[in-house]
Amino acid sequence: MAAATLRTPTQGTVTFEDVAVHFSWEEWGLLDEAQRCLYRDVMLENLALLTSLDVHHQKQHLGEKHFRSNVGRALFVKTCTFHVSGEPSTCREVGKDFLAKLGFLHQQAAHTGEQSNSKSDGGAISHRGKTHYNCGEHTKAFSGKHTLVQQQRTLTTERCYICSECGKSFSKSYSLNDHWRLHTGEKPYECRECGKSFRQSSSLIQHRRVHTAVRPHECDECGKLFSNKSNLIKHRRVHTGERPYECSECGKSFSQRSALLQHRGVHTGERPYECSECGKFFTYHSSLIKHQKVHSGSRPYECSECGKSFSQNSSLIEHHRVHTGERPYKCSECGKSFSQRSALLQHRGVHTGERPYECSECGKFFPYSSSLRKHQRVHTGSRPYECSECGKSFTQNSGLIKHRRVHTGEKPYECTECGKSFSHNSSLIKHQRIHSR
């Protein structure tokens, strides 16, 4: 069987037999869908390579090339004739389930002497020396057959590579390989600077900019630079106010997907971040970091007025209001103002009657968590406030303050009627009943 050859002054003979793959009908039936897709891709690549070589052999006639099948009619080209110098490429028989279905070459219906009375969906028509290739439903002029192959692959792309774990499909094998690492946890791309590993090489390339300080992506609003384009996109939402990630439970929107995922824990009750010191769980990672300062004793935020230090900047800001007298949180019901937002939220329970804090011992409800803690000492017997004079202890600090007046003789409560003073407010109230008789 004579084989068409391609020769250049610097290269040896190359025939299609060197790259051809042959299947019988029986063998073809044993292949699964992914294997058939792979076969199709390989044959298209090989055929595209051969047909594109005519650009470098403009005056060479390639002659006739036979494609051989082992048994019967295999699913690839039987006999094809390739011409150069802009002439059309024709195929004398194309397997119906292969290239003919793709509209890749002009198909002649019979290789046994029958005359074709119609053209296939894909063909080549010569007009004034320029070859027009009919690509399925899209008739378009291409500069070469290789361009047609690329167009056909775009139009007929199938997602042949399927993940056996989750069923997700991909058009490229390397895309499946990248995805598979999600299930295996494999991170083959390691940073030589810090040892951090990544699933994809592109992620490693972006990460390296942390060490090299390369920040090629600039915000056109404020000039801030970013190492990754994705970070720039997130940053731009600061200027646009865009919040594309909305909670389906409460409608609250977020500028970043990670913030939405963390927020969902509010509704699900999920607290995935555990303190290794005390075992307490938190909804947000940032909350865990703040909490851990309780154990470390770190108090980096110091008040410039009195020198008191705090573990969190937010606590310092709230403390400053003690010195400034600022009370920015105002109750819309009664107009009472508070220095802390949490105090306002608790105060609202006075108007709504809401008592969300329940004692697990007796079932009594309280509007404030602080009130619940004080009450629970009734059940535990805890008396943390001790008098330094006599050693008597109390469940609440207010009880200790009142008791100290026994030792100091202080009587801050004065009767407006007769001027008599009392150490306790309750004693003054009782006394005032004498005047009201």
From Swiss-Prot:
Keywords of this entry: DNA-binding, Metal-binding, Nucleus, Repeat, Transcription, Transcription regulation, Zinc, Zinc-finger
Q: Which domain of life is it from?
A: Eukaryota
A Gene Ontology molecular function term for this protein is: DNA-binding transcription factor activity, RNA polymerase II-specific
State where it is primarily located. Answer: nucleus
One GO-annotated biological process of the protein: regulation of transcription by RNA polymerase II
Location comes to:
Nucleus
User: What are the start-end ranges of the zinc fingers (C2H2-type)?
Assistant: 89-111, 133-155, 161-183, 189-211, 217-239, 245-267, 273-295, 301-323, 329-351, 357-379, 385-407, 413-435
KRAB domain: from which residue to which, for each copy?
Answer: 14-88
| Polar residues composition-biased segments | 110-120
GO cellular component, alphabetical, reads: nucleus
Q: Which CDD domains match?
A: KRAB_A-box
Question: Region entry Disordered: which residue ranges?
Answer: 110-129
Q: Which cysteines are joined by disulfide bonds?
A: none
Annotated function: May be involved in transcriptional regulation.
Which family does the record assign? Belongs to the krueppel C2H2-type zinc-finger protein family.
Tell me what this protein is called: Zinc finger protein 154
The organism encoding this protein is Homo sapiens (Human)
Phylogenetic classification of the source organism: Eukaryota, Metazoa, Chordata, Craniata, Vertebrata
